[in-house]
Structures are given as C-alpha cells and as structure tokens.
Amino acid sequence: MEITQTTTPESPRDWPTLLGDNARTGGQGQIKLHFPEKAAWQYRAGSAVRSAPVLREGILYVASVSGALHAIDVGTGTCKWKFQSAGQIHATPSLSGNIVLFGCDDGKVYALDRHSGKKLWEAASQAEVWSSAVIRDGVVFFGSADGKVYAVDAGNGHEKWVQNLGGRIYSTPYAAEHQLYVGCGDGKVSCLAADSGKILWGTPTGNGIDSSPAVADGLVLIGSEDFCVYALNASTGEVRWKYETGLGIASSPAVSGDLATIGSKDGFLYAFDVQTGQLRWKTEVGEVVTAPPVIADGGVCIQAGGLRALDPANGKIVWRAHLGTAIQSVPVLTSDGIYIASLGSEVYALR
C-alpha cells in the first residue's frame, strides 16, 4: 500500500447515509480534508464490499456482498457485532436515530438496533434492493429492481404506499419536504408526492438511469447511461441544461456551493457550474468511474484505480492512495481521517 501526503487528526464526524446526508450531494465542504499518510487499521469483512460504509458515534457500519452487516469500532478496528441476512448486500446502509437500515438482494429492507444488531423489522419488495433507504419524517423510502418505490413506517416497517415506475430502480431517491426524486431503469427521472406516491412529473433521458439524484438551487442533477448529465427544474422536470460525456454515467453527482462534480465511464471526472452547466474542468483519472465523488474543504475524492483527491478549483490530482486492492465503494470523509472498503473484503481507516 502506498499513500502520500500528511495529516493532523481531529475529532470524528458522523456520516449516516450514502454521500453523507439525505441531500445525497456528497458535499461535505464544512469538513477540512486532511490527506492521510498511513492506514491506522485494517478490518477483513470476509467478502467483497461494493456499497459505502456509514458512520455514527464512533461506529462504522459496513455491508458485505456475502450478506453480513458489520459494526466496527473506528478507534480500534474491532467488530462490535455482525448481522447475517438471507441475501447479498449491494446497498449502502442508512442510519436514523438508533436504527440502521439496509436493502438486500432477498428483496427486503432490514431495520436493526444499531447498538446491538438486533432485528427490529423487515419490509419486503419483489426483487433485489440496491437502492439505499432514505428516512424523512418517520417514513422510509426505497426503490427496488421490481420497478417500484416503497414508503414504509420507520417505526414498524408497515407499508404506507407503493408506486410502480415500470423499470428497475437502483437509484437512491432524494427526499425533499414534499417530493421524492428518483431515477429509473426505463430512462426517466420521476418526481413523486412524498405523502402518497403520486407521480407529479417524469422526464425521459435517452437510456437507463442508475445514478442517484442530488438537488441544489431548485435543480435535480443526475446522470444517465445515454452519456449525459442532466439538470432538471425540480418543480416541473424541464431540462435546464445537459452535458454529454464520452460514455454512460452510473456515478452520482456531488455538489458543494456552485460546483457539481460527477464521474463517467469514459474515465473522466467532470466539474460544472450548477446553474449554467458550464464545464469548469475535467480530469482523466484513468479508470471507469461508477462511484460518486465526495467533496470536502480542500479536495474532491474519487475512487478510480485507487483513492484520489483533486483540487476543486482546477481538477489537478493532489493526493492518491494505492491500497493494493480494487475499490468500488465510496469513501467516508471525517475530520480525523478517511474510511473506505474494498472488493478484496478489506476495510481501511486512513489517518
């Protein structure tokens, strides 16, 4: 493993869901990014990790493809508890209060006590759940490969509503106060009423969507397998701007201030002005980019043939870590270091 640069450890910070918070922007500009110089510890999850870890109060929750959810003490790298589900896990867990939730290939979303790992409830769909759960106002929203979006009670898992969108859903919804935004395998970006699931609008793109939307300044930002990044009016679905990259986009956008970044399968990371779509910069990172970037004060982090950090002002690579194993997971950025999991089953704390 090779890591370059230096760090000054500070206090840890929670990271409770995919891309840090329910806004799904991946924008953590309030965190001052310190570039780690070594791995403080390494934990073996027993099988590949394709989803992102989440963090709360010093416990890192990591889901492995073998179906296990691991609760790891970030101070020591030791396992506090482990829960074994009935199917593989590709979805990133989410934390809300004392609950940790995750979707599973057995078609269920599980809710566990985050302190003990005890199962509290489960909610069933009709196909695998790769979409991460979103929790807002006591309701859990998630999409399934059966083409449906589900809303269930966060307290007991009882169904509130189901909406069929017609194509498999791997995209993680964005939950606003009254609306839900999600991409679909049929190529549409849909806006649903959060209280009923009623479809308010749907905007087609030219191919399927696995990207998860971010919402900023009244715009829904999302990528499509038609090679394009889209910015849609959040109220109407009208296309404000779009930009064509060199290949399909499975990555999701990260937004910080007026800067939006997203990766493409063409091997480039792109940065745009949120409102105008003007290209600020693009940087070749040398690998197919499917994971979302994350943004902190001082760097845009992306996994592509190893973990890299780019200067948000110009896209120049300022730091990289070669961990000796392939990574598909999204990193967790905190003020005391970076946590990331690998396809080789390793979970690393970089400090």
Predicted regions and their residues:
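A short beta-strand motif characteristic of beta-propeller blades
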Residues: 39-43, 78-83, 118-123, 158-163, ...
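Short, solvent-exposed mixed-charge patches
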Residues: 1, 350-351
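Blade/loop signatures of beta-propeller domains
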Residues: 4-39
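General secondary-structure propensity
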Residues: 2-8, 142, 317, 321
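Repeat-blade elements of multi-bladed beta-propeller folds
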Residues: 9-22, 46-70, 83-110, 122-150, ...
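Short, glycine/acidic-enriched capping/hinge loops at junctions between secondary-structure elements
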Residues: 26-29, 66, 73
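Short loop/turn segments that connect beta-strands within beta-propeller blades
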Residues: 73-77, 113-116, 153-156, 193-197, ...
